[in-house]
């Protein structure tokens, strides 16, 4: 396995080039970069900029573990929004190819547990289209775990026509659904193509759809997500990392463990803590 870090974890708004340099200085193997908007989006990068970033990454000995193609909102739940979202996803897949990245990660919205729900077909049609294109380019579109349990996600992926996999975030399971990440790895194993290293605790159980609707639109007035879960430094929350890493190894996973730290007073210190914790377990 290899260890990576999301560039935005060094500070939202920090130039991507600076974050790449920080990642190299801390001894990471690769970086995951947000590519939907901002300076690393398809709209922002011309051929010369792509060449410049490739040269920087090569000079620092870094790979691009994945691009993040998350577009926010309700993901692929709204049919009339999907043509534009599919087009953007395909452009991000093309951008991933420019950097030799084999994975594009994204949140897709809340997958209904009932396959007869009309939203299920809307999402399936969109992800099938995205998956076909990604597969044609040698890339996997990796759905980030979050609002649904592993069995629902597994069934959904099985219903696509390839090119769709999993970006497994263990903290999202423990914080939102309450599912043990180890059991999720055992079920999703063959579909896992990228992972996040993140820890957290659930403070109060609720319907995950309520949480993700809040993320998408601002949700229910006065809803405070901090009442329901909390992201914490790796090793201090409810993710059993020794068991989780062991499960990944047993499943044959040999890809990236990419650190994601979205909060905290000193994110870089937490990034180093996560790196050191994972190194002891993965190697």
Task: Give the residues covered by each predicted segment.
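Active-site beta-loop-alpha junctions enriched in small/polar residues
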Residues: 6-10, 34-36, 69-72, 109-111, ...
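C-terminal/domain-terminus segments
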Residues: 253-278
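Alpha-helix N-cap and loop-to-helix initiation/capping positions
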Residues: 44-52, 80-88, 114-125, 148, ...
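N-terminal pre-domain/capping segments
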Residues: 1-101, 135, 190, 246, ...
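A short, acidic, amphipathic alpha-helical segment used as a generic capping/interface helix at domain edges
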Residues: 236-250
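Active-site acidic/histidine proton-transfer and metal-coordination neighborhood
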Residues: 13, 17, 21, 56-63, ...
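Hydrophobic faces of well-ordered beta-strands that scaffold small-molecule active sites
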Residues: 3-7, 31-33, 64-69, 104-106, ...
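Acidic/histidine-rich catalytic cores of soluble enzymes
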Residues: 67, 125-238, 280
